[in-house]
Amino acid sequence: MIENDFLSTVDEIKLREEVKDFVRSVDPELLRKMDRNEVDYPVEFLRAAAKSRLLGLRFPKEYGGRQMPWTAEMTALEEVGVLGMGLGCTYAMVSIVGEALDRFGTAWQKQKFLTPLIGGDKLSAEGLTEPRGGSDFFGTTTRAEKRGSKWVINGEKRFIAGGKVADFYLIYAKTDPKGPGHKAITPFLIEKEMGVRVEEVYSLLGFRGMGTARIVFKDVEVTDRHRVGKINGGATVFNHMMVPERLTSAAGAIGTARTALEIAIKYSTKRKAFGMPIRSFQGLSFKIAESVAKLDAARALVYTAAKAADAANKEPSVDPRRLVSEAKCFATDIGWETINLAMQTMGGIGYTQVYPIERLLRDARLATIWTGSNEIMKLLIQHEVYEMMGEPSRDRDAEMDAMEWYKKVEKVYE
């Protein structure tokens, strides 16, 4: 199998085997039913993962987690991604919403929401995207108005994975109508029974069977108990939450791409053209080699970003966001490219449902768009790099290595 354990600890290698055993136990019919939209949400999959103690790996043991590092979660997510990015997303949702609860939640919130989330007893969803804004998060139009002891929430979120079935939602609403977006938003935990309406379940190219919905809040009332973090402090929560959102997407993309590539490699040894296996043709075999190298490079970047996230948990001055953005952008782009190559390798049969390549391809397309499109990732990366380069440097100034004449004559900046 195309995997690489040189980046992993002994415990993480053992975890990989645990997750592989679990993945092998998943009924293939579940994947087919999800793709036919015959399943609202893979609830039993989550419960089985919880029973195997594979949910919420990073969270404290007192809430049902295993207190493992980010690198361990990357290992698990790559293996779950083998099933496709739909189930990878389902698995990752516990990590994403759980992060907000673990990092910013109160003791009551952790007990009420985090413990049953990790235990597979409650389903969650996160509401970010709105009809008028996806990447422009701070332009949110959902409002939360304080009336007495209650917050009254009005607005809607769309493209919410698990929106149809979730027991509770982590949503962001504007709490200061006059303030700038980054100082005017507050997160809330809203339980479905509080009056959340599911108004549409979307038909999607991929990621089917996920109950992806538009959810509407009409005078939904919550108390301060359900507020996450400080009033108008949503930017702090959001910026932190982008780490689990993007890292989980990156790791899942590697697993999904690896699956497609492995299928194509096996096929290329059996399929013959012009009297020989198609793997004999260098045009094909060189592309396979390039894809393997790119997946290894993507994995190395994902693990580097995960180590940065682990370091940030111990030392607040560490900021992992640039590396996380790089990992999400690179891994999902390479994932999409790799699955396309797998389909091309298999020719016409790769385009049919005889093999799962076409499903994996449809799933992988979304990964380059959600949790911040890859164009947004590049904006974030360049911003961080230019900001970093503006600081005093202790490195050798390589620009001074040119000949004196060239320095004076050729280096024109304006």
For the regions a protein language model found, what residue spans apply to each?
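A short core secondary-structure module
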Residues: K150, N154-V198
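Conserved hydrophobic/aromatic beta-strand scaffold that supports enzyme active sites
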Residues: A125, T141-R143, K150, F168-Y172, ...
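Short Ser/Thr-interspersed hydrophobic loop/turn segments at strand-loop and sheet-helix junctions
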Residues: R53, A76-G81, A173, I190-G195, ...
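Short Gly/Pro-enriched turn/cap motifs at secondary-structure boundaries
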Residues: R132-S135, F159-G162, K178-G179, L204-G211
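Flexible, small-/acidic-enriched active-site or ligand-binding loops
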Residues: G139, G195-T223
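Long, acidic (Asp/Glu-rich), low-complexity accessory segments flanking structured domains
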Residues: D219-V237
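A short, Trp-centered hydrophobic/proline-enriched beta-strand micro-motif
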Residues: G120-L128
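Alpha-helical interface subdomain recognition
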Residues: M1-L83, L87-G88, F104-Q109, P116-D121, ...
